[in-house]
Amino acid sequence: MPRVESLDLFVNTVQQKMQVASPQQSTIFEGDPLLLWRLKPNLGHVYWDFTNVSTNAQSIRADYPIGRKPAGTFRIVCLGDSVTFGYRVPPVWPEKPNDFNPEWQPYPMLLETELRKANPNRSIEVFPMAVPGYTSHQGLAWLRRDIGYLQPDMVIASFGWNDASLSDAPDRELIDTRWTSVTGRWLIDHSQAIAHVTRWMRSRKAATPVVHTPAPRVSQKEYVDNFNAIVRVAKDHGAAVIVIGAPYRDSVTNPAEAQLMTQYRAWLKSEMAKNQTPYLEILELTEAAGSVNQGFFGELIHPNHMGHRLMASELLELMSQRHLVGDLRVPEFVP
């Protein structure tokens, strides 16, 4: 019998299938019992949607293995979605997938490079816990599961567009993180017999049409609640926290969506101020600067390599101002 991929069973909505489970998109993704999908491990320069993707054995876009934190290492985890992942950074073309400028890096890699240069005698790791399509709902679940193992000294968190985007059902229903649901998905992931039975049962139900009313994957209240929980989890494990307001290019291309992004970001900024969490909102990477910020974006949602340089520069400045990285020297970085 042909193999049934757990990704096809875990990802059910039309919107998410288009993002990660279509034949064109699924080349870099696999099923995950907790989070529904994740990056495949050990990818080596795989072309995906104008992006050259490599991952380590832990399914992270990093060029070194990630395990328990070695003694003396300062570790920064960047929790996020396709922005933090580095979508199309650097950009590549299908006819020349390995022809790119290695200095055009996503902001986690830039932070690591600059902090290492400024502290040559220290062990420093900065890596993205970030997957295209993720929301704050998934990011919180991932952090809760792995923070005790990873022991980061700092967590940088940024989510936005996926949270506000419309789906057939909200994440709290589709991505049930209770242990009973996760165990059921684990069994599907590890047993082809169960996977085939699951697919057969769903095919019988598919004959009955269901009318869906699209809603945000994560409501504004849930969005703020998730970030508050991310901050609490990080602080409970002794990690400093920075929250980044999600980038969005302009308010002209899609006015309704831009308004949602403005609202989500405003709620988040207000809530982070209440609990005195360092919050970074980069004006040039928001719709408020839409008439002059095209040079920082690849398209409407994702900053290009110059946008990521700006993010790294602003993050380093905030780290220095707020003394967030202990005794590390924080360099100035010109975008």
Labelled PLM ranges:
Residues T73-R75, N121-E125, L150-V155, A193, ...:
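Loop/turn elements at helix/coil->beta-strand transitions in domains of secreted/extracellular proteins
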Residues Y107, V131, S158, W267, ...:
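Catalytic cores of nucleotide-enabled group-transfer and carboxylate-activating enzymes in metabolic
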Residues M1-V77, R88-P90, E95-N101, Y149-Q151, ...:
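N-terminal secretory targeting modules
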Residues R61, P65-D153:
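Membrane-embedded segments
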Residues S136, L140, Q220, V224, ...:
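Short, amphipathic alpha-helical "lid/cap" segments that border enzyme active or binding sites
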Residues Q105, G160-K269, I282-Q294, D327-P335:
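Serine-dependent acyl-ester chemistry module
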Residues V83-N101, P128-M129, T213-Q220, P255-A258, ...:
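Second-shell loop/turn segments in exported
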